[in-house]
Amino acid sequence: MYGYVDKNGDGWRELPDGSPLVLMSATQPDQRNRQLNELLRKHMNAIGLNIVFKPAKWPENLKAARAGKLQMWGVASTAAGGDGQSILERYYGPSAGQGNLARFKLPAFDALFEKLTGLADGPEREAVFRDAKRLAVAYMPYKLHCHRFVVDMMYGDVVGYRRPAYWLDWWHMIDVAPQPAGRA
């Protein structure tokens, strides 16, 4: 596809000029990431793509990503608001090297994002969201492929716990009920 084919018969695709095509993916040296890497390697190899994983500690990978030194890196995210504007900032050109780790720059998207920040909730804002999301999907600087689910278990004496819809900070809203006398 587009000249990225196996030209020398070694089983791996090459760049259109015939030089080796090797994907370099940053990762962390832990069991969960090793399992995800093996799954990704299996699927990349199935389509003839050679992928090499470079493990480093998470802060080192973040520093390299902000400096624009990584080709690929898998990171997770958590919703921060009801409408997803904070997630769309990852595609905003002026945020390159901060929230926009892919350093994606597209003037059409940037204009939509800037318009979005000044609009109140309503049909016009929703239409701008739709257009921005379409550009993000079409250019795909981020490949979203995993949705994590969280299951909560709670001790009976915990009072006031309710998982927030956004963010992960719930600990300041709980208390432990005093135990009745005679209960150990």
Language-model-derived ranges and their functions:
Residues 53-63:
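Short helix-initiation/N-cap motifs at beta->coil->alpha
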Residues 19-29, 51-54, 71-72:
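Short, well-ordered beta-strand elements
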Residues 40-51:
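Short alpha-helix C-terminal cap/hinge motif
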Residues 31-42, 61-184:
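Detector for C-terminal structural segments
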Residues 2-24:
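Immediate post-signal peptide segment of exported/extracytoplasmic ligand-binding proteins
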Residues 7-13, 53-55, 124, 128:
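Surface-exposed patches in mature extracellular/periplasmic domains of secreted proteins
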